[in-house]
UniProtKB/Swiss-Prot annotation:
It is found in: Cytoplasm. A motif (Beta-hairpin) lies at residues 92-115. Forms a heterotetramer with UvrA during the search for lesions. Interacts with UvrC in an incision complex. One of its GO terms (biological process) is nucleotide-excision repair. One of its GO terms (cellular component) is excinuclease repair complex. This is UvrABC system protein B. The lineage of its organism: Bacteria, Pseudomonadati, Pseudomonadota, Gammaproteobacteria, Enterobacterales.
Length: 673
C-alpha cells in the first residue's frame, strides 16, 4: 500500500532553502530531538519542510495553531504530494458545549455537540493511513493532544476479510455491529451496511466514495469487490480487505465488562467518601447517573459521555496520559510544529482549563474522579511523546530556542528576492493625519494598507474617521468568526476596500501580497501587542510586496521596537547582499485570490478523474467560490438530497455529476472553516 514520497513541484529549492533543507536533514539523521527553522514570511517554509519529508521518507505530523492554517497547510501538502496520503485531523465539532456545573447558581449544563460528518470521516482516514502505510503526512490542529481511542484496541477490533476464508454470514453481521456499523437496507451511507441474500454491502466509515461488496457462497467468501456506492458500478476486485471501526472509541465486549466492574468499585469507594462528608445529594446524584451509564453500557456497549470512563476502557492507571494521535504515529515519525510561537503555548494551556471544569463536576457528584483522566495531554506528556521535532516560525519563542540550542536554521532569503519592509518611526502627535496621507498614496496605485491599534475603541474611532474622509475601510475585531475573517481578507485582496483596521492583525501564515503598508499606531507602548515578536509578525504582513513598508508611530524607541527594527534590518541586509551577488531583481508575488478559500479545488478535480465511465467533472463555479461557509453547508445538504433522488430514480450519470460537485464544495467548506 505504501509508496515512496514523491514531491510534485515545478520549482527547485532556491535562496536559503537548499542550505536549510541540508541542515535540517543532517540534524535529523544525527538524531537531534529539536531543531528550529527560523523562516521569514514568504520564504517558502512549507516547501522546505516538504523537501525534508520527501528526502527522508518518514511519516510526518504537522501541527498548526488553528483550523484556518491547518486547512491552508493541508491544501499545500496535497499539491506537493498528490500521490501520497495527505490527511487532515482537526476537531470534528461544528459546535461543542462541554458539560459543566455552576455552583453559585446551581446550574448544570448538559453536554451538547454538533459533529461534522465529513471531518469525522477525514479523522478516521488519517488514523487508517498511519496504521497502514508510511508515506503519510497528517496535518493536525491541537486536537491531536486530546484523547482518542486506544490504537491497540482499535487494531484488535478490525475485521479482516480474505477471498476463500470460511466465515458465517451472521458472524460478519455480528462483527460489523461490534464495530458500531448499523444495518440500513434503504439509505446506504457512510458507516452502514445492507444485506441482500448472500451479498453484504459495507460502506466503510473512513471512505468518501468507495464501498465494499462481500459475496458469500455458503460459508465461504467468494469475492470481494470495491464499488461506487452511488452508481453501483464495480471499480475493482481485491484479494483481501480490512474494515476499520466506525469510531475511534470502540471497545471489545470483554473489555467493557471488565471496565464495568472497575467502575462499580470506584463508585462504591466514592459513595463512602461523599457520605462521610455528609454530601447526601451528591451521593444520590452520582449513584443514579453512574448506574444509568452502566446499564446503557451493558445493553448497547456504549453510553452518552462514555469518554469519561476512558481510563477503565483503555486499561490505564490513575493519572496516566490518555491515548492520542501521537500513539498512532510510528516511532521514527517526524513532528513539525508550524507557527510554533503560538502552537507551543496553546498545547501548554489546554490541560489546565479542562481540569478546572472537571474538578467541579467531580466535587458535586456529577462524575466519578476517574473522569479527570479523560483529558488532553499535559505539556510534559506531550514532550515525552513527541518524536524528533522541527519548530517552524518567523519569530520562534523562548521554549523552541532553548530546546534547539545552536540548531536554529535561518531561512531569510526569499526565492522571489523580496526584501523585508523598510521601517520608519514617526511621531505619535500627527499619526492619524500622516496615516491618512499614506493611505491615499497607496489607494491611488491600487495597493492595500493594514493598520493596527491598541484598543477596540481606538480602532472603531479610526475606522469612523477614515470613512468620514472618504476612504474605503473595514474593521476586523474579535467578534468576527474565522469564516468571516477569511472573507474580509479576500475582499481586501480583491480591492473591495483599501484599508483594514484591527487590534491584533498578526494572522500568522495568511498571504496578502497586495498589502504594501503596515501602520502600527502607539508602537512605543510596551506590552503583549507591542512585544518584539508581535511587531516582527505585524511588520511581516508587508513583506510579500515589492514596495513593502512599515511605519511605527512612537515618540520613543522601546527595547522591543529596537529589537524588531534591528532583526528586520539584519534580514534585509542579508537579503540585499544575496540579491546583489546573484543578480536577482525582487519580484512581487502574484497569488490568485481564490487560493485562500479554494485550497481543495485541484484535489477534488484529481479525485474525480478516472473513476468509471460516464463521469464528468462538475467544476465549482465562481458562485460557489463567493459563497459564505454557511451558504456552502446549505448547498451541500441540498445537493446531497438531489444526488440521492437521482440515484433512487436510477439516473446515475446525473447523480455522479452532483457527487463530483459535492467533492469540490466539501473541500471549499474545509478550507473556509
Amino acid at each position: 500500500m505504501s509508496k515512496p514520497f514523491k514531491l510534485n513541484s515545478a520549482f527547485k529549492p532556491s535562496g536559503d532553502q537548499p542550505d536549510a533543507i541540508r541542515r535540517l536533514e543532517e540534524g535529523l539523521e544525527d538524531g537531534l530531538a529539536h531543531q528550529t527553522l527560523l523562516g521569514v514570511t514568504g520564504s517558502g517554509k512549507t516547501f522546505t519542510i516538504a523537501n525534508v519529508i520527501a528526502d527522508l521518507q518518514r511519516p510526518t505530523m504537522v501541527l498548526a495553531p488553528n483550523k484556518t492554517l491547518a486547512a491552508q497547510l493541508y491544501g499545500e501538502m496535497k499539491e506537493f504530494f498528490p500521490e501520497n496520503a495527505v490527511e487532515y485531523f482537526v476537531s470534528y465539532y461544528d459546535y461543542y458545549q462541554p458539560e459543566a456545573y455552576v455552583p453559585s447558581s446551581d446550574t448544570f449544563i448538559e453536554k451538547d455537540a454538533s459533529i461534522n460528518e465529513h471531518i469525522e470521516q477525514m479523522r478516521l482516514s488519517a488514523t487508517k493511513a498511519l496504521l497502514e502505510r508510511r508515506d503519510v503526512v497528517v496535518v493536525a490542529s491541537v486536537s491531536a493532544i486530546y484523547g482518542l481511542g486506544d490504537p491497540d484496541l482499535y487494531l484488535k477490533m478490525m475485521l479482516h476479510l480474505t477471498v476463500g476464508m470460511l466465515i458465517d454470514q451472521r458472524a460478519i453481521l455480528r462483527r460489523l455491529a461490534e464495530l458500531q456499523y448499523t444495518r440500513n437496507d434503504q439509505a446506504f451511507q457512510r458507516g452502514t451496511f445492507r444485506v441482500r441474500g448472500e451479498v453484504i454491502d459495507i460502506f466503510p466509515a473512513e471512505s468518501d466514495d468507495i464501498a465494499l461488496r462481500v459475496e458469500l457462497f455458503d460459508e465461504e467468501v467468494e469475492r470481494l469487490s470495491l464499488f461506487d456506492p452511488l452508481t453501483g458500478q464495480v471499480e475493482s476486485t481485491v484479494p483481501r480487505y480490512t474494515i476499520y471501526p466506525k469510531t475511534h472509541y470502540v471497545t471489545p465486549r470483554e473489555r467493557i465488562l471488565q471496565a464495568m466492574e472497575e467502575i462499580k468499585d470506584e463508585l462504591a469507594d466514592r459513595r463512602k467518601v461523599l457520605l462521610a462528608n455528609n454530601k447526601l445529594l451528591e451521593e444520590q446524584r452520582l449513584s443514579q447517573r453512574t448506574q444509568f451509564d452502566l446499564e446503557m453500557m451493558n445493553e448497547l456497549g456504549y453510553c452518552s459521555g462514555i469518554e469519561n470512563y476512558s481510563r477503565f476502557l483503555s486499561g490505564r492507571g490513575p493519572g496516566e496520559p490518555p491515548p492520542t494521535l501521537f500513539d498512532y504515529l510510528p516511532a521514527d515519525g517526524l513532528l513539525v510544529v508550524d507557527e510554533s510561537h503560538v502552537t507551543i503555548p496553546q498545547i501548554g494551556g489546554m490541560y489546565r482549563g479542562d481540569r478546572a471544569r472537571k474538578e467541579t463536576l467531580v466535587e458535586y457528584g456529577f462524575r466519578l474522579p476517574s473522569a479527570l483522566d479523560n483529558r488532553p495531554l499535559k505539556f510534559e506528556e506531550f514532550e515525552a511523546l513527541a518524536p524528533q521535532t522541527i519548530y517552524v516560525s518567523a519569530t520562534p519563542g523562548n521554549y523552541e530556542l532553548e530546546k534547539s540550542g545552536d540548531e536554529v536554521v535561518d531561512q531569510v532569503v526569499r526565492p522571489t528576492g523580496l526584501l523585508d519592509p523598510i521601517i520608519e518611526v514617526r511621531p505619535v502627535a500627527t499619526q492619524v493625519d500622516d496615516l491618512l496621507s499614506e493611505i491615499r498614496q497607496r489607494a491611488a496605485i491600487n495597493e492595500r494598507v493594514l493598520v493596527t491599534t491598541l484598543t477596540k475603541r481606538m480602532a472603531e474611532d479610526l475606522t469612523e474617521y477614515l470613512e468620514e474622509h472618504g476612504e474605503r475601510v473595514r474593521y476586523l475585531h474579535s467578534d468576527i468568526d474565522t469564516v468571516e475573517r477569511m472573507e474580509i481578507i479576500r475582499d481586501l485582496r480583491l480591492g473591495e476596500f483599501d484599508v483594514l483596521v484591527g487590534i491584533n492583525l498578526l494572522r500568522e501564515g495568511l498571504d496578502m501580497p497586495e498589502v504594501s503598508l503596515v501602520a502600527i499606531l502607539d508602537a512605543d507602548k510596551e506590552g503583549f501587542l507591542r512585544s518584539e515578536r508581535s511587531l516582527i509578525q505585524t511588520i511581516g504582513r508587508a513583506a510579500r510586496n515589492v514596495n513593502g513598508k512599515a511605519i511605527l508611530y512612537g515618540d520613543k524607541i522601546t527595547p522591543s521596537m529596537a529589537k524588531a527594527i534591528g532583526e528586520t534590518e539584519r534580514r534585509r541586509e542579508k537579503q540585499q547582499k544575496y540579491n546583489e551577488e546573484h543578480g536577482i531583481t525582487p519580484q512581487g508575488l502574484n497569488k490568485k485570490v481564490v487560493d485562500i478559500l479554494a485550497l481543495g479545488q485541484n484535489i477534488a478535480k484529481t479525485k474525480a478523474k478516472g473513476k468509471g465511465k460516464g463521469r464528468s467533472t462538475a467544476k465549482a463555479g465562481i458562485v460557489e467560490l463567493d459563497m459564505t461557509p454557511k451558504a456552502l453547508q446549505q448547498k451541500i445538504h441540498e445537493l446531497e438530497g438531489q444526488m440521492m433522488q437521482h440515484a433512487q430514480n436510477l439516473e446515475f450519470e446525473e447523480a455522479a455529476q452532483i457527487r463530483d460537485q459535492l467533492h469540490q464544495l466539501r473541500e471549499l467548506f474545509i478550507a473556509a472553516s
